């Protein structure tokens, strides 16, 4: 017979085992849930994939089949982009054609019906926001500063017609009849002509704009003799005109919009309203789904010019920085390509006062960053939100713009493997701003090695991204089973 103490001890032991058994059951349930999430993730936890479509060269059946294959393959969403094919007529099947509009909407409907996300590039191709048939000379199209340079040796003067074309190698670019004069400036040169860069005196710049004479025959002349006969000068003629940056494939030539003036966004709106948002049934699906406008790497180009511009760039700069930027525009000539983060921060010309050069260029790129946000990213985002569409953008690397502030002006910031070389330290240029804004950060992943990738290569890229603080992967790229036809 058990004593009272033994009975009490047995009861207490059993009572102690009950919470332990309960905890073990909870641990098993938690482990099972974690395993389920990894082995059978919900659609919201999956990665996405981009599909560069061969213009409108697919049949309805193959479009449906490809989208279904993406869904069955475990992808959360699809990013759609028009790409050119040599054997396909751009006029009939390119971006902006009736057939392209049909194919794009069919792909969107199919994906949205499956509960997938859909992203649309901001134009044909991936490089820019562009519009087929846009007047390249209008303020809605990308505008640049075209620079023409003359050398005035010591003791010399100049007279007669001013040069009206720019030579770049064997090519000649005329100043268009629609071009607008920005200004003419004489800059003292303090180094020899063979110096790289040519050094100048930023404190002795002389404006000559008011000395220009428009003759009756349309010729523009300038007569000027330097007061200091011992100085040599560079004369810079600055004109604003369209960059005429094209993006194929399109039914009409598609020109890059102006990223620094809201006229560019107005042109983009007109296209979207006429070609994408003109279907009420699809618009209802967009409102209920997850649709994004996607801006890929910012590959806008000054073409043969030296800087981006808009009608009131000089006025905006003066209001924000307190001085005239026009006399210093020559400092933007020949600046190196920043796609791979070149450390050199001077171009063909420099100032004797390098601190002044650094300040001037930083001020210019700060103002342009502000205009990029205020006149492009933010009004575009506000307008698209009316239709239930979010914005996703590979923020401003590759250009002389600040790369963290624009994160505030999009819904989803993005980086890419190709430019950042899958380096965690480079990714931090994006993760800091994204975390401060508490925004989902994605990456275009798999763009570096093409078909040379192994599965382990893909995994390593993904691991690096997640370790760096990224939340979302968009794989580059979907290989369609069916070719055009």
Q: Model segments located where?
A:
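Bacterial N-terminal signal peptides that target proteins for export
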Residues: 1-11
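Active-site mouth loops of central-metabolism enzymes
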Residues: 50-61, 448-454
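Hydrophobic targeting/anchoring helices
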Residues: 127-130, 387-485
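Mature extracytoplasmic enzyme cores
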Residues: 29-41, 46-48, 58-73, 77-79, ...
């Amino acid at each position: 017979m058990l004593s009272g103490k033994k009975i009490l001890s047995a009861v207490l032991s059993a009572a102690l085992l009950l919470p332990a058994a309960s905890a073990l059951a909870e641990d098993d349930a938690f482990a099972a849930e974690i395993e389920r999430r990894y082995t059978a993730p919900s659609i919201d936890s999956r990665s996405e994939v981009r599909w560069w479509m061969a213009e409108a060269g697919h049949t309805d059946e193959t479009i449906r089949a490809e989208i279904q294959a993406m869904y069955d393959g475990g992808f959360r969403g699809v990013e759609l982009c028009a790409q050119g094919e040599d054997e396909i007529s751009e006029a009939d099947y390119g971006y902006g054609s009736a057939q392209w509009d049909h194919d794009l909407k069919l792909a969107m409907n199919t994906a949205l019906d499956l509960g997938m996300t859909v992203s649309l590039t901001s134009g044909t191709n991936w490089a820019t926001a562009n519009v087929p048939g846009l007047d390249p000379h209008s303020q809605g199209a990308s505008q640049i500063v075209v620079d023409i340079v003359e050398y005035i040796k010591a003791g010399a003067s100049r007279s007669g017609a001013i040069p009206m074309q720019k030579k770049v190698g064997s090519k000649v670019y005329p100043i268009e009849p629609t071009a607008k004069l920005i200004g003419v400036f004489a800059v003292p040169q303090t180094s020899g002509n063979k110096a790289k860069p040519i050094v100048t005196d930023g404190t002795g710049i002389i404006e000559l704009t008011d000395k220009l004479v428009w003759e009756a025959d349309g010729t523009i002349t300038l007569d000027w003799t330097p007061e200091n006969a011992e100085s040599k000068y560079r004369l810079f003629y600055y004109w604003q005109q369209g960059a005429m940056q094209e993006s194929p494939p399109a039914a009409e030539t598609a020109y890059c919009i102006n990223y620094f003036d809201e006229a560019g966004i107005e042109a983009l709106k007109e296209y979207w309203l006429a070609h994408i948002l003109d279907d009420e049934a699809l618009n209802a699906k967009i409102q209920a789904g997850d649709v994004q406008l996607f801006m890929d790497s910012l590959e806008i180009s000054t073409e043969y010019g030296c800087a981006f511009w808009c009608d009131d760039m000089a006025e905006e700069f003066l209001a924000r920085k307190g001085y005239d930027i026009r006399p210093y525009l020559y400092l933007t000539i020949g600046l190196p390509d920043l796609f791979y983060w070149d450390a050199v921060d001077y171009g063909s010309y420099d100032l004797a006062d390098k601190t002044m050069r650094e300040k001037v260029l930083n001020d210019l790129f700060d103002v342009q960053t502000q205009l990029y946000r205020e006149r492009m990213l933010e009004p575009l985002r506000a307008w698209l939100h009316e239709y239930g569409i979010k914005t996703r953008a590979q923020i401003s690397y590759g250009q002389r713009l600040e790369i963290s502030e624009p994160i505030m002006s999009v819904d989803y910031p993005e980086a890419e493997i190709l430019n950042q070389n899958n380096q965690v330290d480079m990714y931090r240029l994006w993760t800091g701003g994204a975390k401060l804004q508490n925004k989902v950060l994605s990456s275009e992943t798999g763009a570096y090695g093409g078909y040379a990738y192994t599965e382990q290569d893909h995994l390593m890229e993904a691991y690096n991204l997640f370790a760096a603080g990224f939340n979302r992967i968009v794989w580059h790229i979907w290989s369609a089973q069916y070719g055009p036809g």
